[in-house]
């Protein structure tokens, strides 16, 4: 009976360590960040969706997803970017 208790204890410790390891990996998961913005306005009909970058990024950004599957970094303080985001929210 002691062997099965010891085996159970080892199993529980192993599971706890695995959970800690996977939790730390999830916290370090890379996120999409922008280091520069597009210099010109892109046509709104090219845009399919958008998301905002993580607060962990050094530069706040909006990333537009085009209908062709490309990601375009844009400055969230630009008026056209705010309009596109607003329009996408209304159409969702």
From Swiss-Prot:
Matches recorded under InterPro entries: Chemokine_b/g/d, Chemokine_CC_CS, Chemokine_IL8-like_dom, Interleukin_8-like_sf
Protein name from the UniProt record: C-C motif chemokine 3
SMART domains attached to this UniProt entry: SCY
CDD domains from the UniProt entry: Chemokine_CC
The keyword Kinase belongs to this UniProt entry's keyword annotation: no
Pfam families recorded: IL8
UniProt entry tagged with the keyword Secreted: yes
Species of provenance: Pan troglodytes
The protein's role, per its UniProt record: Monokine with inflammatory and chemokinetic properties. Binds to CCR1, CCR4 and CCR5. One of the major HIV-suppressive factors produced by CD8+ T-cells. Recombinant MIP-1-alpha induces a dose-dependent inhibition of different strains of HIV-1, HIV-2, and simian immunodeficiency virus (SIV).
């Amino acid at each position: 009976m002691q062997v099965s208790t010891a085996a159970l204890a080892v199993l529980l410790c192993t599971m706890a360590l695995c959970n800690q390891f996977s939790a730390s990996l999830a916290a370090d998961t890379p996120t999409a960040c922008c280091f520069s913005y597009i210099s010109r306005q892109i046509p709104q009909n090219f845009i399919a969706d958008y998301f905002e970058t993580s607060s962990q990024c050094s530069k706040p950004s909006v990333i537009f997803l085009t209908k062709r599957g490309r990601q375009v970094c844009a400055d969230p303080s630009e008026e056209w970017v705010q309009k596109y985001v607003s329009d996408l929210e209304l159409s969702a």
